[in-house]
Amino acid sequence: MPPHLALPFRRLFWSLASSQLIPRRHRGHSLLPTTPEAHTDGSVPVFIRALAFGDRIALIDKYGHHTYRELYDRSLCLAQEICRLQGCKVGDLQEERVSFLCSNDVSYVVAQWASWMSGGVAVPLYWKHPEAQLEYFIQDSRSSLVVVGQEYLERLSPLAQRLGVPLLPLTPAVYHGATEKPTEQPVEESGWRDRGAMIFYTSGTTGRPKGALSTHRNLAAVVTGLVHSWAWTKNDVILHVLPLHHVHGVVNKLLCPLWVGATCVMLPEFSAQQVWEKFLSSEAPQITVFMAVPTVYSKLLDYYDKHFTQPHVQDFVRAVCKERIRLMVSGSAALPVPLLEKWRSATGHTLLERYGMTEIGMALSNPLTEARVPGSVGTPLPGVEVRIISENPQKGSPYIIHAEGNERGTKVTPGFEEKEGELLVRGPSVFREYWDKPEETKSAFTSDGWFRTGDTAVFKDARYWIRGRTSVDIIKTGGYKVSALEIERHLLAHPSITDVAVIGVPDMTWGQRVTAVVALQEGHSLSHGDLKEWARGVLAPYAVPSELLLVEEIPRNQMGKVNKKELLKQLYPSGQRSQPGQG
């Protein structure tokens, strides 16, 4: 056992021995009992609710502990400075965009809340994005101001100067406490519902990233649905390790706990060692909730395999995780079943899989307390309506409905049982528009107002299953349609494969050929012939990869996703095609 974990293990051993590992009972969820009557409007921003939680600890980061009252006061001070700088006489930016670049710490929350308090739309930037992308986001959103943490000031100053956008550096008071109280200027508690709140930029797999503009109502709809379905309470403590420019990191992992008065422990960035230390620490507050992408869970298991080798240590880790942590969630990318099973063996937790995207927040989720089925994304969350459809070549109706459901249940059209189709979503969580792109916004919705996700899905066994992006994950080969994600799930069970991406490569004979891009376990080898022989035992003949490409590493973004269009371009430059079986 590594020395840095020895002390936490000893402390935990005695605390757990004394309690005899009695399972913690998680009581049924009571919706926000601490919320004052004046704040029961479900569409208010999260900072309006902060005063109800006063001196409770909201955040713990490298700078220390920060209460809800402190977050509110510091945010209000910054909001007033923003208004002074921008010259807004009535204290309202009228939805002007405020870009901000902050680390995963208290500065992010203060910048976000201040953007809202001043009447602006928050545009979060990410420090790992290249300068050209940061410039694009600031320019495309037409931000009137850029708020920046001290550590990024030198990097952003030339960029802001070139764009002619004012730069507002954060002061030490944001991190360590205000030296003066904000001017008494109460923030309005009504009128937020339809105002713009945040612009999240999409991954840009079909061109330049688009800014998805969500209102305060949209954000609140996602948050309240998750708070109810996942039983968030003020006693929860979540460990935050994800980037803060996507729905997963911002809404699921930050706004949800702050909505109910819970505590968020923020790491500057992901570290497998630090995550395990937090899981196993006997010091208060102890982690009760964890959410991450599959890549994070994979790296945590790599650390587990290297450092927790003794059986009694593994038993100890499993016991602590089961007793202390009530919920572990995976999302943003498909969760390989072997990874789910290995995590369950190590921690006793079956990861909760869910489905969402930038434009809709969260839409589908496995149950909190009932059985979770690997590979399924469960059923609709509260307030969400979904449809699975196919285009209708006949006049009179825009499409044929295969299945239609909400949180109360799903109705399947006779004759369309277990038929795949495009997933549509409708509800208060669906975004308002693509910023400054009316035509793209219009084409993203059906004529009757449903958002087109671009994902292929199926309803079977009383659950929804995502087959993948229709554009890249549904491969048409020899007259068959096969799911790249399904093939990937099976191939990841091969003992020599550590990562895989399945792509459809244009082919004169088959239309597309199934190509497996594979990263191998260290010291392993794999031929195409061996892979085909193995795959025939788990896949239909037409789904067996006709080509194998071996790579050192499969490129993934910060959320664990593979840009398959870019991967195809990298592996097959214009005019070049490798022969089947290469690798």
Curated annotation (Swiss-Prot):
Transit peptide, from-to: 1-27
GO molecular function, one term: acid-thiol ligase activity
Compartments, as annotated in UniProt: Mitochondrion
Entries under SUPFAM superfamilies matching the protein: Acetyl-CoA synthetase-like
Its EC number(s): 6.2.1.76
Entry's Gene Ontology cellular component terms: mitochondrion
Main EC class the enzyme belongs to: ligase
BP GO annotations: fatty acid biosynthetic process; malonate catabolic process
Catalytic activities: tetracosanoate + ATP + CoA = tetracosanoyl-CoA + AMP + diphosphate; malonate + ATP + CoA = malonyl-CoA + AMP + diphosphate
Keywords from the named record: ATP-binding, Fatty acid metabolism, Ligase, Lipid metabolism, Mitochondrion, Nucleotide-binding, Transit peptide
Pfam families: AMP-binding, AMP-binding_C
Alphabetized PANTHER family for the sequence: ACYL-COA SYNTHETASE, ACYL-COA SYNTHETASE FAMILY MEMBER 3
Family: Belongs to the ATP-dependent AMP-binding enzyme family.
Function recorded in the entry: Catalyzes the initial reaction in intramitochondrial fatty acid synthesis, by activating malonate and methylmalonate, but not acetate, into their respective CoA thioester. May have some preference toward very-long-chain substrates.
Protein known as: Malonate--CoA ligase ACSF3, mitochondrial
Source organism per UniProt: Mus musculus
